[in-house]
């Protein structure tokens, strides 16, 4: 199982999901769901998370989290670990509850968080578990729409602020917005299965990731062009572009060109004064 996403920085926004092992239920009854939300409340307070939306299904959950500190991986490890232990004690079982680790997509807040908030609370409607989002008790919809008090872990101010300053009017507009959302999917700009955002957002993330050695190279450069396309008919400048701009290693370039990596290194040094690399 691949390591989960390790792109962590203050202000990062994530769509997080985790599924039951072998598609088994991770929530068998209401006490399980309350236990999970209580655990989540403790974790988000400890690690400085803001929750904009959530939905608990039967064999998986969705969370939309904004981190004030770079703590996603530590917090998720605690959330799933503590809940698994409590679930196993309660149901007198042993073994894994979740299918591997969680999955997280880092999200461009301004462009995609609003649509994702709608997508998450419509999940029960899409799978025909209920007819409307308001009929599902275990999501953030009812609290955001003003139908029930908001739990302490849910931050609704940003979301409702997208619909106006007057609270009741914003809630009414939010209800209309969700009602009109069936059939819409927010994943058109998903890149590499772990990024949702524009090219400018990707460029900013790439700059951040260059400073994070723990991020796998394939995640640092999710939208880079193929090596053969970079090197085609570009000579030494192509080598410089592949190495400096797109993060290909000397060994990768050498293997592609079928030369020794020392040859690639020597050709690369010739381009050190090239300004457009």
Please name every model-derived segment.
Residues 60:
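Short acidic-rich active-site patches of cyclic nucleotide enzymes
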């Amino acid at each position: 199982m691949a390591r989960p996403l390790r792109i962590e920085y203050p202000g990062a926004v994530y769509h997080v999901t985790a599924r039951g092992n072998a598609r088994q239920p991770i929530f068998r009854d209401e006490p399980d769901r309350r236990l999970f939300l209580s655990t989540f409340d403790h974790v988000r307070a400890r690690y400085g998370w803001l929750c904009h939306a959530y939905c608990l299904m039967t064999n998986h959950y969705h969370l939309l989290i904004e981190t004030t500190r770079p703590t996603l991986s530590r917090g998720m490890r605690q959330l799933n670990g503590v809940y698994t232990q409590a679930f196993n004690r309660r149901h007198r079982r042993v073994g894994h509850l979740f299918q591997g680790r969680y999955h997280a997509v880092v999200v461009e807040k301004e462009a995609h968080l609003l649509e994702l908030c709608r997508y998450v609370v419509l999940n029960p409607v899409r799978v025909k578990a209920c007819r409307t989002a308001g009929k599902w008790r275990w999501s953030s919809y009812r609290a955001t729409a003003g139908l029930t008090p908001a739990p302490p872990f849910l931050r609704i101010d940003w979301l409702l602020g997208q619909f106006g300053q007057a609270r009741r009017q914003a809630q009414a507009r939010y209800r209309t917005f969700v009602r009109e959302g069936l059939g819409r999917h927010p994943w058109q700009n998903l890149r590499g299965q772990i990024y949702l955002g524009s090219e400018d957002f990707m460029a900013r993330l790439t700059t951040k990731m260059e400073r994070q050695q723990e991020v796998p190279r394939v995640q640092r450069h999710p939208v880079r062009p193929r090596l053969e396309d970079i090197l085609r008919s570009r000579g030494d400048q192509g080598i410089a572009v592949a190495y400096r701009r797109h993060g290909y290693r000397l060994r990768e370039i050498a293997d592609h060109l079928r030369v020794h990596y020392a040859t690639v290194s020597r050709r690369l040094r010739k381009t050190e004064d090239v300004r457009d690399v």
